[in-house]
Amino acid sequence: MFDNLKFTIMHSRIFQISTEPIDKENYLNENTLQQGDGGFYDYCSEIDDDVRKEDIANLVNYVLPKGMFELISDDTLRYNGGIEQWKEEYVANVKKKAEALTVDNMLEWGSTYYLKQAVENPLDVAYHFYLDGDGCQAFAEQSFAFMEFVCGLEPGTTLYIGGVIDYHF
């Protein structure tokens, strides 16, 4: 009966990243963010250490712009520079999406959605970023917030990864 249906499980990760070491007691965890009614996240859940390591490696090696970051330990990254190129690519992509928007297609779902995604999510992933090392922030953000964060870094800056959690949306 369900053979012809394609189910997509809508899970992704939230990464806590800071320029300061993060105490374990301040790690992002499954109870940090608002969930359920009124929140973006249906629910959040912890992941085990092996999955966490794989997710961090995936973030650095396949999601973040190539060469901009280097994994130097299980919990630390080095920012190598490259934000100017990322910003140029970002602006070019937003312009491309904006040029595709016309009076004829502006009310169609895809054209405005893709432009909005290009603006808010330059990495084009479902990963979110929690940029608070103290664990007090009540929200995580899409990749534009991470891009803004990186704009304030100097090459060679060490970044610390705290909690990494799964979320369902």
Where do the protein language model's features map onto the residues?
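Short, well-ordered helical secondary-structure segments
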Residues: F2-N4, K96, A118, A140
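Short, extreme N-terminal segment that most often corresponds to the first beta-strand
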Residues: F2-Y43, L159-F169
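Acidic, proline/glycine-rich low-complexity IDRs
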Residues: N4-M10, Y127-F169
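Residue-level signal for the start and early helices of compact helical domains
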Residues: K6-T8, N31, V60, L77, ...
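Low-complexity, serine/threonine/proline-enriched polar segments
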Residues: Q35-G135
